[in-house]
C-alpha cells in the first residue's frame, strides 16, 4: 500500500468541501485510490490522506487527479508528501 498526503487551501466551507470530495471519489477510485480521509487543519485548510493500491497508480495519476480535483472543487494544493505504508494498526 502507498499513501499520499495533500494539503489544500479552500474557502472555509467544510460541508461543501466534504460534498465535493464525495462527488470526486469515484474518479479517484478509478485511478487506484482505496481509501481517503480528510482533516480540517485550519480555517481555510484541509489535509487529505489517500491510500492507493500501488506506488505505480500514484505515479501514473496523482498530478492529474490533484489538478482535476482542485478545478472541480475550487481548492488549491499547498503541499504534499507520499510514501509506502510502514505499519497499519486497527
Segments predicted by a language model, with ranges:
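Short S/T/G/P-rich N-terminal loop/turn motif that feeds into the first structured element of a domain
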Residues: 1-68, 74-90
Amino acid at each position: 500500500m502507498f499513501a499520499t498526503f495533500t494539503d489544500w487551501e479552500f474557502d472555509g466551507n467544510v460541508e461543501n468541501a466534504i460534498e465535493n470530495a464525495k462527488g470526486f471519489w469515484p474518479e479517484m477510485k478509478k485511478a487506484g485510490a482505496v481509501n481517503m480521509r480528510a482533516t480540517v487543519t485550519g480555517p481555510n485548510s484541509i489535509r487529505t490522506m489517500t491510500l492507493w493500491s500501488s506506488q505505480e497508480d500514484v505515479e501514473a495519476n496523482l498530478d492529474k487527479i490533484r489538478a482535476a480535483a482542485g478545478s472541480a472543487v475550487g481548492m488549491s494544493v499547498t503541499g504534499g508528501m507520499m510514501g509506502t505504508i510502514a505499519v497499519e494498526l486497527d
